[in-house]
């Protein structure tokens, strides 16, 4: 890729050069050269020495100019697909909940299920169901899960505003079986899971190439840090799906009597 001559400022050409350089060693090039960061360390290896710039007044570059400067073949769309195998370890330290565990701890949300969404009938659980906005969309789900989602979305807004603005919900509370099953109850039935879409596009569940949307892979670590398990790790990959992990649910159980 032809970057062009240096323009003497951290403008579009410089940012394009940085992201092109980063593409050789970073999974997600960001155009940043931070003190002690990996990019500066790599530059040092090739003999780069920072210039003295204390007499230079920095020029402010607009977010739009930065976006246009980053090569499309490096960043691409947030809905572009990346191999699950390229993402490393998923859900470190977290464990998904089973039907047996959920029924033991919270009881059945209702007595009968089908492949279609049906209302929750459990008197115990109904009092903990909440409908509210979590930022980019409104959800209905288990109250502590909804509260947790609000915190997650607030963090995504700060760290990845472009992804935040593209996020939509494909449903949270939905009493039904897992897709393709007539025995396994979906964790959506307890209001403790959510399916996400980006720019209105759903990640295809169990696609032959076992790929996931890039944007979902970026925000998955934030969900993990808040105790949510990413469905991309399921035997049948389900990257649109995020659910409350066992350890997080255990923290809530005393308040869900």
Predicted feature residues:
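Cell-envelope/ECM-targeting effectors and their regulatory/trafficking segments
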Residues: 1-117, 254-256
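Second-shell loop/turn segments in exported
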Residues: 3-8, 28-30, 132-143, 182-183, ...
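Surface-exposed patches in mature extracellular/periplasmic domains of secreted proteins
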Residues: 3-6, 29-32, 160-172, 230-235
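Active-site-adjacent loop/helix surface patches within enzyme catalytic domains
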Residues: 150-192, 203
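Catalytic cores and adjacent binding grooves of peptidoglycan-active enzymes
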Residues: 181-257
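Extracytoplasmic/secreted envelope proteins and their assembly/folding machinery
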Residues: 15, 40-43, 146-153, 216, ...
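Active-site acidic/histidine clusters and adjacent loop/turn architecture
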Residues: 101-166
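A generic secondary-structure signal for well-formed alpha-helical elements
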Residues: 25, 47, 153-160, 227, ...
């Amino acid at each position: 890729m032809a970057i062009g001559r240096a323009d003497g400022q951290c403008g579009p050409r410089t940012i394009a050069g940085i992201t092109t350089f980063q593409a050789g060693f970073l999974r997600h090039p960001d155009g940043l050269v931070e003190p002690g960061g990996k990019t500066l360390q790599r530059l040092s290896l090739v003999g780069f020495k920072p210039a003295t710039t204390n007499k230079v007044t920095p020029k402010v570059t607009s977010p739009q100019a930065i976006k246009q400067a980053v090569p499309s073949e490096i960043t691409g769309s947030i809905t572009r697909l990346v191999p699950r195998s390229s993402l490393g370890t998923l859900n470190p330290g977290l464990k998904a909940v089973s039907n047996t565990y959920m029924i033991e701890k919270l009881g059945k949300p209702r007595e009968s299920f089908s492949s279609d969404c049906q209302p929750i009938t459990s008197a115990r659980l109904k009092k903990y169901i909440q409908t509210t906005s979590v930022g980019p969309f409104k959800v209905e789900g288990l109250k502590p899960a909804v509260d947790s989602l609000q915190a997650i979305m607030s963090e995504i807004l700060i760290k990845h505003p472009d992804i935040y603005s593209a996020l939509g919900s494909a449903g949270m509370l939905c009493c039904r079986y897992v897709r393709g099953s007539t025995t396994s109850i979906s964790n959506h039935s307890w209001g403790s899971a959510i399916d996400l879409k980006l720019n209105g596009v759903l990640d295809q569940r169990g696609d032959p190439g076992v790929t996931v949307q890039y944007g979902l892979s970026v925000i998955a670590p934030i969900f993990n840090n808040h105790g949510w398990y990413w469905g991309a790790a399921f035997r049948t990959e389900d990257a649109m799906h995020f659910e409350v992990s066992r350890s997080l649910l255990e923290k809530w159980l005393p308040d869900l009597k």
